[in-house]
């Protein structure tokens, strides 16, 4: 992939950009083999890739500059701003949104936050696009609620320019730290969730719910999990760290009993909405800590699917799963190193199959799906 920002030395986020996609996949596959060395794997499935550019459905932009000439992008460690509107990872549909937002910021009087001076209001712009219908969610991350009245007053102009903006919010992040969002979310539109659809499964994206940033590869990840589960004798399943329910909603059948657990209430609200649309009455989603939920149960499901954050599921949950001994475990991971550590704490399981998904091209990161069978 050719990138003018990288060539000019202004951005180094895509550290592997000089390698071909095939070279990147080979290196990632070798890394996964290294991490799983000593763990018997019955089947290595071919890695899954996707587009090398224009694949991201989300932009996280630091806002700097002035209210008359705002700049969207990032700040180097020395405070130097870099305009990332031309980043080739973004789809072409983002460009008109960035173009309209620059004069809008002046109209609304949203002074960009100055990190050095600790002054200003607008810290970040967070933009998400649905691949289903092109609808978008825009979040203004503000230092305070001071400019809310001005923002509301100026919104009709912005919505006339950009009718694809279905969900608009103001997130309040008052802390002088590089934290992307605060706890308070104020909706500026009637619609509060963005509709998405993978493999004919309805999904919903809310402001504070995690959603994969590479829809093409994510849809194949979910479809693969569905295929694997469909080949197994599963009537009762847990989906831990379930997020908006992507895995569980794909894997569930009308006859299957499935419980999805996620600590974020916003994500659980999305999952429940999707389950209702699908008419799956035996799916139950709850906003709880996954480890605390699992260790408090007295029953053993046929299969436990885990999709933890980068830190992995941790030894306490590994120990409990080893003791509870479900027949199957599916582990989806964005950090193969912690996944390998966790699997080593499950000595009574063998990896039946494993597959790499190149969710993050031009970086060393990747997603992995592993099916474990009890010995």
Swiss-Prot record:
It comes from Salmonella enteritidis PT4 (strain P125109). It is an enzyme of class 2 (transferase). The keyword Iron applies. SUPFAM superfamilies: S-adenosyl-L-methionine-dependent methyltransferases. PANTHER family: RNA M5U METHYLTRANSFERASE, TRNA (URACIL(54)-C(5))-METHYLTRANSFERASE. Keywords: 4Fe-4S, Iron, Iron-sulfur, Metal-binding, Methyltransferase, rRNA processing, S-adenosyl-L-methionine, Transferase. Catalyzes the formation of 5-methyl-uridine at position 747 (m5U747) in 23S rRNA. GO terms for molecular function: 4 iron, 4 sulfur cluster binding; iron ion binding; rRNA (uridine-C5-)-methyltransferase activity. It holds the Pfam family tRNA_U5-meth_tr. The active site is at 334 (nucleophile). This is 23S rRNA (uracil(747)-C(5))-methyltransferase RlmC. It catalyses: uridine(747) in 23S rRNA + S-adenosyl-L-methionine = 5-methyluridine(747) in 23S rRNA + S-adenosyl-L-homocysteine + H(+). InterPro entries: 23SrRNA_MeTrfase_RlmC, MeTrfase_TrmA_AS, MeTrfase_TrmA_CS, SAM-dependent_MTases_sf, U5_MeTrfase_fam. Belongs to the class I-like SAM-binding methyltransferase superfamily. RNA M5U methyltransferase family. RlmC subfamily. S-adenosyl-L-methionine binds at residues 212, 241, 262, 307. Its EC number is 2.1.1.189. One of its GO terms (biological process) is rRNA base methylation. [4Fe-4S] cluster binds at residues 3, 11, 14, 87.
